[in-house]
Design a protein with these regions (language model features):
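Binuclear metal-dependent phosphoesterase catalytic core
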Residues: 157-205
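Core catalytic region of metal-dependent phosphoesterases/phosphodiesterases
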Residues: 2-6, 11-94
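Active-site environment of divalent metal-dependent phosphoester hydrolases
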Residues: 10-15, 39-42, 65-71, 109-111, ...
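Beta-strand-turn-beta hairpins that frame and shape the catalytic cleft
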Residues: 1-4, 96-103, 171-177
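Charged helix-capping and loop-helix junction motifs
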Residues: 44-52, 81, 119-125, 158-163
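His/acidic metal-ligating clusters that form di-metal
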Residues: 26-30, 82-153
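Short, conserved loop/helix-junction motifs that constitute active-site signature segments
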Residues: 52-55, 132-134, 171
């Protein structure tokens, strides 16, 4: 199966639809948005964004913008927030797991602080912490806004920047963290489970 991956579109409906169309055209059978599909400062776009995600069957996880917006809506409404938009935000998981693959906005888990902490801060300390606390073979994440690959080999962790259009092999005997980059910067990717390769994709405006 080919997985189309995107993150951090931040309320841009046009680039979101462009990414969906391009990833589908290149054979992605499952699409996953790794959070921050909305912009907490532009809540008026949220209903349309949710409509695009649902119409195109895109799975999503909660990002820090969705978390912040959910709290803002709840505080302003003063009720249970039972409209479709609020219900969708409340239903978003902090992470999703598919076999040995986890999808999250940043640090997986149920602690909202993990939505705000970047895995990529220019070094490997955060990735080392994450590898030590988790067991998944692959983690696909966003939030850091730059396509980066962390590999764990023989207890050594390497950080590699992923260039646009680059294809990287992810061996079954290694663990890896893949930051897909920000869709608002034209970055997305496809993971091919059959060949164990991840390819960075450029989404033009």
């Amino acid at each position: 199966q080919r997985l189309g991956l995107m993150a951090d579109s931040h309320g841009d409906l046009h680039i979101l639809q462009r990414a969906i169309d391009l990833l589908r055209a290149q054979g992605a059978e499952l699409l996953v948005h790794l959070g921050d599909f909305c912009d907490s400062l532009r809540p008026e776009t949220l209903a349309d964004i949710i409509g695009i995600l649902q119409t195109n069957g895109v799975l999503a996880v909660r990002g820090n913008n969705e978390y912040a917006l959910e709290r803002t809506i709840a505080a302003g409404r003063g009720d249970k927030g039972d409209n479709p938009t609020s219900l969708f935000l409340r239903s978003l998981p902090f992470h999703r797991t598919m076999g040995d693959i986890t999808f999250a906005h940043s640090f997986p888990g149920d602690d909202p602080r993990g939505l705000y902490e970047p895995i990529d801060a220019g070094g490997t300390n955060e990735a080392a912490t994450l590898f030590g606390k988790t067991t998944q073979r692959l983690l696909f994440a966003g939030h850091s806004h730059r396509p980066v690959l962390f590999r764990r080999r023989h207890n050594q962790i390497a950080r590699e920047e992923i260039r646009p259009g680059e294809s990287v092999h992810l061996p079954r005997n290694e663990r890896a963290i893949i930051i897909v980059g920000a869709l608002e910067n034209g970055e997305a990717g496809i993971y091919d489970q059959k060949s164990d390769t991840y390819e960075s994709k450029r989404i033009s405006p």
